[in-house]
Regions:
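Conserved phosphate- and dinucleotide-binding cores of soluble alpha/beta proteins
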Residues: 89-203
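N-terminal active-site beta-alpha-beta segment that forms phosphate/nucleotide-binding
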Residues: 2-119, 123
Length: 203
């Protein structure tokens, strides 16, 4: 699949995921980062990587598709930074030592506000995980069209808490990997893709 128009590509992915019943029927995926069947397994694939095992601080988008990523980070004793939805309330830091026994609850959007604290100063980030609508094998990433993911990554670079070689991953369904994602100058690239079946590294 190779489309030059971002909106057309988003609509195509959303339509396919709904038609093939890959997206969560309780949360229509149009206009969203899709919550897909297999998101738990994709998080598990990411969890099995050396990049994950070495990471002490994980940054995650607040999307439902990445909820297991956030839960696994806390269960594995990693500090977790979550962007607040639409970045309306900044960034939230969750300490695994303070949520023991409540990792599942703390990994939700509501739970992050309950158990976490707003970040005043960023710690170094070892792994970034973003949600995506579509990705390609050159690192192109397409979000839902609001530029939140790009803004988050740019902010982390600006704060000097990530470097060019920091793993920037996404968890997606195989159907979300396309031939080419339209990329503009402001778009931030990823370098890892985890699906329910495999992990792909982009060099």
């Amino acid at each position: 699949m190779n489309m030059k128009n971002k909106d057309k590509l988003r609509t195509c992915i959303w339509d396919m995921m709904e038609a093939r019943k890959i997206s969560n029927p309780e949360k229509p995926c149009h206009g969203r980062i899709p919550d897909f069947k297999g998101s738990k397994e994709a998080a598990g694939m990411l969890r099995s990587t050396e990049e994950w095992k070495k990471a002490e601080v994980v940054f995650s988008s607040p999307d439902t598709a990445q909820i297991k990523v956030r839960e696994y980070a806390l269960l594995d004793g990693k500090k977790l930074i979550m962007a607040s939805p639409n970045l309306e309330r900044g960034y939230i830091l969750l300490d695994p030592l303070k949520v023991q026994g409540s990792e599942k609850a703390a990994s939700s959007k509501e739970g992050a506000f309950k158990f976490g604290t707003n970040i005043q100063r960023f710690p170094g980030v070892d792994l970034v995980v973003e949600g995506s609508v579509a990705v390609d094998m050159s690192g192109g990433r397409l979000g839902k069209g609001k530029s939140y993911g790009d803004t988050e990554i740019v902010h982390l670079f600006h704060e000097k808490v990530i470097k060019e070689d920091t793993p920037i991953a996404t968890t997606v369904h195989e159907i979300q990997i396309v031939d080419s994602v339209p990329v503009e100058a402001h778009d931030q690239k990823i370098n890892m893709i985890a699906t329910p079946e495999r992990v792909l590294r982009i060099f």
